[in-house]
């Protein structure tokens, strides 16, 4: 699951860079939402993995 979160985080970062850079002005709000959701999911998955003691990514 952590692998999927990292994948979506990378996609959100790319979308955020395009959105914040003014290239895709209409998608700025969507990129912001996806970016923050991906960060939250990444942090939750990382914390759960740490507490379970698994080192899989």
From Swiss-Prot:
Keywords: Cell membrane, Membrane, Transmembrane, Transmembrane helix
Topology relative to the membrane: Multi-pass membrane protein
Location of the protein in the cell: Cell membrane
Cleaved signal peptide residues: none
Disulfide bonds: none
Regions that span the bilayer: 4-24, 30-50
Main location: membrane
Plastid in keyword set: no
GO cellular component, one term: plasma membrane
UniProt similarity note: Belongs to the UPF0391 family.
Full protein name: UPF0391 membrane protein RPA3505
Protein source organism: Rhodopseudomonas palustris (strain ATCC BAA-98 / CGA009)
